[in-house]
Amino acid sequence: MAIAPVQAKERLLWLVRDLPPFTILEGAAKGQGAIDRMLALLIEQMPEYDHDIVRVTRARGIQMLQDPASFTCDPTLMWTPERAKFVHFSKPALGAMSGGLVVRKQAEPLLAPFLDGAQIDLKRLLSDTQLKLGIVAGRSYSTQIDAILHPLPDSVLSRHYGNDATANLLQMQRLGRLQLVLGYWPEVRYLIQQQGGSLDDYQFHPIQGVDRYQFLHVGCSDTPSGRAAITHIDQLLSALRQDTLPALYARWLDAEFQTEYLEQSRHFFEGR
């Protein structure tokens, strides 16, 4: 009696980069980021695929998602109109604190004319001064922040393309080669501590006109395989995003924000 051949599983490539506290690829907390933990839970519950986790830069990850021959997913994507042309997105998975402006306190006087309370008028700051802003190439900082950056001349932006882009931008800032860095405070806080710096030397400013929270999605290649994967991922996220992910993210926040975040996270997905 002939035995039917075992059908090979499709290979799903998960694209990750070092993005603490979402994904942590090195050091004592390796694999303990909020999205690291989510990804492990998704993989465990998606046995229909062979899963590979691949480290890429943000720019390279976007290239791979655009390749119609590639079956790839990224668990840390923000929705943008441009990406929606070639990525099939999951429902929102995790609400995260929005990005903002990171400066060393010695540079604070330069910002004074552009502050409204703690919030910075980023567009006016970059238009009216000679200061350059460090950003990660290919990263979306939310549709609202992207809309501020898009019309600015390239001369005011210092783009970093490497694997450890934010860490390298902070190092440039510490050495005085760059005064402004765009980043997420939980990520920046983690990296400053990893570099042996003091948080007391830094100030974080939310950006005027930007919502307090933004939402990460899983995004897969917009192909039949990618769309099928997202259908399954959406089913799994319904419970994960309510019951599991908020606490995994909150542990990386400043202590005084943790309770407030967990309370607000209960309402993130009403109607979503």
State the predicted function of each range.
Residues A8-F86:
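Extracytoplasmic small-molecule ligand-binding "clamshell" domains
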Residues E10-L25, Q32, D116-T143:
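Short loop->beta-strand "edge-of-pocket" segments that line small-molecule binding or catalytic clefts
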Residues V16-P20, G95-G100, G196-D234, T259-E263:
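Periplasmic-binding protein-like
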Residues D36-M46, K105-Q119, S127-D128, K132, ...:
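Extended ligand-binding regions for polar small-molecule ligands
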Residues L39-P47, R124-N163, I192-L199, R251:
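Ligand-binding cleft/hinge of the Venus flytrap
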Residues E44-Q45, V54, A59-T72, P151, ...:
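Short helices/loops that flank or line small-molecule/ion binding pockets
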Residues D50, I120-A147, D234-R272:
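Ligand-binding clefts/hinges and TM-proximal coupling segments of bilobed small-molecule sensing domains
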Residues V54-S127, P206-V210:
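Acidic, polar ligand-binding/catalytic clefts
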